[in-house]
């Protein structure tokens, strides 16, 4: 094997080229590659974090929706209970008012009935006395009249 100066020159030039590349070209390339890798890793981490945040937000939204439905059902149930209570109170009040009106009516009827009975008793007593006077054709003294009226009223 024969080494000539061209081969040695090429070897020296290649070594200088490799040293130059290692010193000036390789570090910026490695920095660019590392920076790119870091950005990609950060992007993937951000994407994973965003996916987790999205899942968390969806779970939270689902929970809030369930809570809202439960709350709405509770409100509807309370409203139905209140409605039933109001209807029951209205029925109770109406029944009480009806009973009161019926009692007043019965009391008025009873009072009117008693008044009419008393008037009829007086009229019957007066008619009986008038009939008796006509039959006897004489006038009864006031004491006897009063006594007869009282007896007739008691009998009637």
UniProtKB/Swiss-Prot annotation:
Entry keyword Manganese: no
Subunit structure: F-type ATPases have 2 components, F(1) - the catalytic core - and F(0) - the membrane proton channel. F(1) has five subunits: alpha(3), beta(3), gamma(1), delta(1), epsilon(1). F(0) has three main subunits: a(1), b(2) and c(10-14). The alpha and beta chains form an alternating ring which encloses part of the gamma chain. F(1) is attached to F(0) by a central stalk formed by the gamma and epsilon chains, while a peripheral stalk is formed by the delta and b chains.
A GO MF label: proton-transporting ATP synthase activity, rotational mechanism
Name this protein carries in UniProt: ATP synthase subunit b
A GO-annotated cellular component: proton-transporting ATP synthase complex
InterPro entries in UniProt: ATP_synth_B-like_membr_sf (IPR028987), ATP_synth_b/b'su_bac/chlpt (IPR002146), ATP_synth_F0_bsu_bac (IPR005864), ATP_synthase_B_chain (IPR050059)
Transmembrane segment boundaries: 7-27
Membrane topology: Single-pass membrane protein
NCBIfam families noted in UniProt: ATP_synt_b, PRK05759.1-2, PRK05759.1-4
Gene responsible for this protein: atpF
Superkingdom of source: Bacteria
SUPFAM superfamilies assigned to the protein according to its UniProt record, in alphabetical order: F1F0 ATP synthase subunit B, membrane domain
Gene source species: Shewanella baltica (strain OS155 / ATCC BAA-1091)
Cited function: F(1)F(0) ATP synthase produces ATP from ADP in the presence of a proton or sodium gradient. F-type ATPases consist of two structural domains, F(1) containing the extramembraneous catalytic core and F(0) containing the membrane proton channel, linked together by a central stalk and a peripheral stalk. During catalysis, ATP synthesis in the catalytic domain of F(1) is coupled via a rotary mechanism of the central stalk subunits to proton translocation.
Keywords, ordered alphabetically: ATP synthesis, Cell inner membrane, Cell membrane, CF(0), Hydrogen ion transport, Ion transport, Membrane, Transmembrane, Transmembrane helix, Transport
Subcellular location(s) per record: Cell inner membrane
């Amino acid at each position: 094997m024969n080494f000539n100066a061209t081969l040695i020159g090429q070897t020296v030039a290649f070594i200088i080229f490799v040293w130059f590349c290692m010193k000036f070209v390789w570090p910026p390339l490695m920095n660019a590659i590392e920076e790119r890798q870091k950005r990609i890793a950060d992007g993937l981490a951000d994407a994973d974090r965003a996916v987790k945040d999205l899942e968390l937000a969806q779970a939270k939204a689902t929970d809030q929706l369930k809570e809202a439905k439960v709350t709405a059902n509770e409100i509807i149930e309370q409203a139905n209970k209140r409605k039933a209570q109001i209807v029951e109170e209205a029925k109770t009040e109406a029944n009480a008012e009806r009973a009161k009106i019926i009692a007043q009516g019965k009391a008025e009827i009873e009072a009117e009935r008693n008044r009419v009975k008393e008037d009829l008793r007086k009229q019957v007593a007066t008619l009986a006395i008038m009939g008796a006077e006509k039959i006897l054709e004489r006038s009864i003294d006031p004491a006897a009249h009063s006594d007869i009226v009282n007896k007739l009223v008691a009998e009637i």
